[in-house]
Amino acid sequence: MFAVISLFATVNLAQAEEPRPDKFGLLIGGYTLARYSSNISQTEPDLGAGISISPEDTLGLDIENTVLRIEGYYRFRPKHALTYAWYGINSTGNKIIDNEFEWVDPGGNPITIPIDAQVTSSLDYDIFKVGYLWSFHHTDKVELGVGTGLHITRLAVGLDASITAPPNQPLQNVDTTVPLPVFSVVLNYHVTPKFLWYLKTEAFVLKFDDWTGSYRDTTLGMEYRAWKHVALGAGLSSNALEIEEDDLNYQLRFNNTISGALLYVATYF
């Protein structure tokens, strides 16, 4: 028995001393939303900011509790990598509303959705990220890097109301994609050869053409390399997004805040 334990310890030590695969990484996990809050308004161009509604409260949207989240990188040089990430939140609702609100039709004309109107709604919120990371300090113990890239938000909101004022008017749906540049900072610290904790943060504030946007995203996590090519991880993540669009036919305002826990499996080659 002692010989078997000694052999197992020797094998583990030898494996720990082997270089960790680090050229390609893929993370797949579940993002459990502890908090999701948002506000949206779509009004005629000259009205101003208008009154925002909460899709969850006003429209009865049932936001998913856990969503799929994918992240990863391709390290084409020891200090240079391409990064990517995606997750999406989808929801539908059907509610007889108890507070009237304003919207617009496809021509930009104001519409009132009165109390007791039955509203069928849908929300699709997708986040895509692609970027470049420069690890200006990269050792077996610590990786510290900065990067830049694109944060691409796709927002689609569909509404259909049984009663409108003026009557029988279609509602202007929201379907927009906003690619905005981000700046990122990454810190990875190996407590042991197999265990690390990490911090990733991204941010931007930008105005261009008809768009104004701001975004921040922070993830703090830890990861255990259970096998040479497979790791198990957990983390806490939060982000906030604000976008404004001034179109010829409408003004769109949208902001949301998301926070939650991430559990995942990662593979490395």
Language-model features and meaning:
Residues 79-82, 140-142, 193-197, 229-232:
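Repeated loop/turn-to-beta-strand initiation elements of outer-membrane beta-barrel proteins
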Residues 196-209:
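Transmembrane beta-strand segments that form the barrel wall of outer-membrane beta-barrel proteins
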Residues 16-89, 262, 266-268:
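Short glycine/proline- and aromatic-enriched beta-strand/turn motifs that initiate or cap beta-hairpins
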Residues 198, 218-219:
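Structural signature of Gram-negative outer-membrane beta-barrels, strongest in the C-terminal barrel
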Residues 28-30, 70-74, 130-134, 148-150, ...:
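Residues on the lipid-exposed face of transmembrane beta-strands in outer-membrane beta-barrel proteins
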Residues 23, 65-69, 125-129, 143, ...:
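Transmembrane beta-barrel architecture of outer-membrane proteins
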Residues 36-66, 88-126, 152-178, 206-209, ...:
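Extracellular/periplasm-exposed beta-strand and loop segments of Gram-negative cell-envelope proteins
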Residues 1-23:
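Cleavable N-terminal export/targeting peptides
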